[in-house]
Amino acid sequence: MSLDWLRTPVASRADPHEILLPVRTRYIVATLLSALALNLFALPGVLQSIRPDFIALTLIYWVVYHPRRVGFLPAWFLGLVMDVADGSLLGQHALAYAVLMYLAILLHRRIVMFGMRHQIAHVAAILIASQVIMLGVRLMSGAEFPGVLYFGPSLLGAALWPLLFNVIRVPLRPRSDPDAV
């Protein structure tokens, strides 16, 4: 099985005749609410501790590929919702998502030009930076260091980046015309 698709830039892999449909605000909201539902869905034991942050991944996607459509306010609000849902220190996720958004905005032009392998590395770095912020807040509030496995969800999230990339784009691709020659 060839992994050449990991090396070539996304822009050069796309069909030159493929033009994605315009993104509607309700689709962005639907993807963010779906990500919130995936974050809140209860999983048994070990799976709960390695679940990636789907909100963070979805925010990264929208900021990288449509930087003018999603801003800091939705990220901050979703962070507060996650803080309440997790029972964590209020503002912890919100601050982490704000930093995540800043890094994604800062790197979005660079990420778009890279192949999927390099995109995965950038997404992993952004997710780990976000988790470091949350860990710092926890440590300052008196919690103990959870160990290096704490960063496992970021690595798993980065590994899921190609899947998320393709799943979000499915409705944005135009339907094939049955009358086309």
Model segments located where?
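Terminal, non-globular segments
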Residues: 1-181
